[in-house]
């Protein structure tokens, strides 16, 4: 008995992971948890890129299209830069305010 996993299965996993990250962004109040949720969303996009690259109509067995893999690596690089800048900002804010709770960030209001 062989079970084949198609494009729909990968897209379902990607959508579930994206929804989980989106839920974390909207519900969590800690900046670090929000950054982790954004990383989940970016990884869901990577899963979709790789799945579309694998199951695309132009992906013949004899060819090796790397469009999805290159896009996924690009998203990983952007995510690494985003997390580095985000954590630097979190550390700077924590040193000044002694909190990482987003509900207490009202110093940009007039």
Curated annotation (Swiss-Prot):
Protein family (similarity comment): Belongs to the complex I subunit 4L family.
GO cellular component: NADH dehydrogenase complex; plasma membrane
Xref: Pfam families: Oxidored_q2
Keywords in alphabetical order: Cell membrane, Membrane, NAD, Quinone, Translocase, Transmembrane, Transmembrane helix, Transport
Catalytic activity, EC: 7.1.1.-
Reactions listed under catalytic activity: a quinone + NADH + 5 H(+)(in) = a quinol + NAD(+) + 4 H(+)(out)
Organism classification: Bacteria, Bacillati, Bacillota, Clostridia, Eubacteriales
NCBIfam families membership: PRK05715.1-2, PRK05715.1-3, PRK05715.1-4, PRK05715.1-5
Record's subunit section: NDH-1 is composed of 14 different subunits. Subunits NuoA, H, J, K, L, M, N constitute the membrane sector of the complex.
Transmembrane segments: 7-27, 31-51, 73-93
Protein purpose: NDH-1 shuttles electrons from NADH, via FMN and iron-sulfur (Fe-S) centers, to quinones in the respiratory chain. The immediate electron acceptor for the enzyme in this species is believed to be a menaquinone. Couples the redox reaction to proton translocation (for every two electrons transferred, four hydrogen ions are translocated across the cytoplasmic membrane), and thus conserves the redox energy in a proton gradient.
Topology term for the membrane: Multi-pass membrane protein
Protein name: NADH-quinone oxidoreductase subunit K
């Amino acid at each position: 008995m062989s079970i084949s996993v198609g494009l729909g299965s990968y897209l379902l996993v990607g959508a579930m992971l994206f929804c989980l990250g989106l839920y974390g962004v909207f519900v969590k109040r800690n900046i670090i948890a929000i950054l982790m949720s954004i990383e989940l969303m970016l990884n869901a996009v990577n899963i979709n890129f790789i799945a579309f690259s694998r199951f695309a109509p132009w992906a013949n067995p004899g060819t090796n299209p790397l469009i999805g893999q290159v896009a996924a690596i690009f998203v990983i690089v952007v995510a690494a830069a985003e997390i580095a800048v985000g954590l630097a900002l979190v550390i700077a804010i924590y040193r000044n305010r002694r909190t990482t709770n987003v509900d207490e960030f009202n110093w940009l209001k007039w």
